[in-house]
Structure formats: C-alpha cells, structure tokens
Amino acid sequence: MSSAATALQGPQPNALPAASHLDRLEAESIHILREVAAEFDNPVMLYSVGKDSSVMLHLARKAFHPGTPPFPLLHVDTTWKFREMIAFRDRMAAESGMALRVHINQEGVARGIGPFSHGSAVHTDVMKTQALKQALDRYGFDAAFGGARRDEEASRAKERVYSFRDRHHRWDPKAQRPELWNVYNGRIHKGESIRVFPLSNWTELDIWLYIHREGIPVVPLYFAAERPVVERDGLLIMVDDDRLPLAPGEIPRLERVRFRTLGCYPLTGAIRSEARSVPEIIAEMLDSSSSERQGRAIDHDQSGSMERKKREGYF
C-alpha cells in the first residue's frame, strides 16, 4: 500500500506526512520557472484555472517571493467556461498581484461558434487553439508556461519540458530537442516560441498531495456537491446556465458529483462522488482505475485527436 493511502487511513486524515518526492518536484519546477524568466524576453503563464494551473501559480509565487512573478497570466476564454471558474480566476489573479490578460477569439464569437452549433472539434479549434495563437501573436510572447503533465495523455507523455513551436505555433515531435541532465535549450529565431511545462514530471496524485500539503485553493467544482446534471453519451453534463439545450423530455436532476478535470462545461463530464475534501479526493483517486481525462469530450473526437490538436497549436 502506498504511503499516501496509509496516511489517509490514520486517525487524523488531514495529517499527511511530508513527502520528500514533493520537495524534489517543487525544486525542479521552481528551477524551470526561474530559468525561463531569466532566458526569455517576454514569457507568460497560461492560467486555465484548473488544479494544475493552481499548483503552477503557487509555484511561481514561491519562486519569486517576496516579489511578484515577472510575467503576466493569460486566460483564453472560450465563453463556455463554468461560472465558478471565471469567479475563481479573477480572485486568484487579484490575490497574486499579477497582470491578467483575457483573450476571446472575437472572430469566432462573430461567427457564432459554439459546442452545440458547430461541434466540439470546431469549437475547440476556433475558440481555444486559434484564440491561443492570436493571443501569443498579439502580445509577442516568446515562452508560455502550461500545466500539462506527461501522465495525462499519450501525446503529452513524449512532450519535452521546453516544447519548441515554429512561427506558426505548430508542434513537431521530431523537431524537439534533447534535455539530458535537465539542461534546456531555449534558443529560438524571431517568430518562434517555446511552450514550457514545469509540471511535466508530476502525476495527478502528486498534484493533489501538494495541494493538500501547501493548502492551495482550488475551484469548488473539484469537490462533491449536489449539482444539476443531464446524462449524454455516458457523460454527466452539468447545467451551468440556460444556454444548454435540453432534448425533448430531458429534465436535469440533482446528483452529488464533482469534476476531476475542468474545461468548457458542455464538454466536461462530472463523476458521481462523495469526496468533499482533498484527503477524500486522494483516497477516492487511489481506488479508481479510470483515466483523469475520461470526462473530456474533446479527447474523444477521433483517435489521436490530442496529438493532432497539438500539431495545430493547441497547448
């Protein structure tokens, strides 16, 4: 049995022991954050408001304490995020003292692009991938931090910490650079950029153990509560506002659910759960055999869809 599971079975479930591997992961991530800040002219941190972004923001604030991290936050708003995510984003950005850049693809808005009118693939491409590329070009960012981890998905498993992108923001796995002994090559030509993943070597369990140890706030959607949902294609979709079209006879019902991963609310499935605290989330996760991203509809558009999205410029 793992040390995490043993600790959670003790008489005080909130008293997890210090984990030395978390210290090593923290040190590695802080080193990467400082390296990028020193090496690049105009870095930015992509803040998607999820648990990984929350850990990455916490690490950035630690890395540059007592000062403010020397780069802004960037949030690509698809206009379909959970309302709780937007409120949490604004609160955490204000608390950090970092500038927050919010970018919406206005061309997509003008065309009426959405997950129901055009489908998840088109919506994701226009309102996330193309919007991200617009924002990077608009502000001239040459390095962008992201919270992706190698354990999440197959294409991310072969991602470098410094992920090279050409002048069109495209990712070519064959053009990536070796990173022997944690030495990173950030040399780029004008117009090229690097996506940087400080959490590459973390796992989902590491993220939650660190959130617990550090007391990092996360969006309440991660905790079980009664929420209005409808079941579609095996996914429990939360009815977050009145834009969700209901099928004839379809009636939202209250269920105790939470989210393991967060995205656009019509494309993100909840899971039935009783976990209302971080230790309970960790215990539930240790007993689960399902993938963290099982509830992300965009991952199931086609086989290998994540790698195609990355080649097109997706984070």
Curated annotation (Swiss-Prot):
Reaction catalysis annotation: sulfate + ATP + H(+) = adenosine 5'-phosphosulfate + diphosphate
The keyword Transferase is annotated on this UniProt entry: yes
Pathway: Sulfur metabolism; hydrogen sulfide biosynthesis; sulfite from sulfate: step 1/3
Keywords associated with the record: ATP-binding, Nucleotide-binding, Nucleotidyltransferase, Transferase
Chain intervals with Basic and acidic residues compositional bias: 293-315
Family annotation (InterPro entries): PAPS_reduct_dom, Rossmann-like_a/b/a_fold, SO4_adenylTrfase_ssu, Sulfate_adenylyltrnsfr_sub2
Pfam families: PAPS_reduct
Region (Disordered): 287-315
Keyword Nucleotide-binding: yes
EC number: 2.7.7.4
Enzyme class: transferase
GO BP field: hydrogen sulfide biosynthetic process; sulfate assimilation
Entry function: With CysN forms the ATP sulfurylase (ATPS) that catalyzes the adenylation of sulfate producing adenosine 5'-phosphosulfate (APS) and diphosphate, the first enzymatic step in sulfur assimilation pathway. APS synthesis involves the formation of a high-energy phosphoric-sulfuric acid anhydride bond driven by GTP hydrolysis by CysN coupled to ATP hydrolysis by CysD.
Assembly and interaction partners: Heterodimer composed of CysD, the smaller subunit, and CysN.
Record protein name field: Sulfate adenylyltransferase subunit 2 1
Originating species: Alkalilimnicola ehrlichii (strain ATCC BAA-1101 / DSM 17681 / MLHE-1)
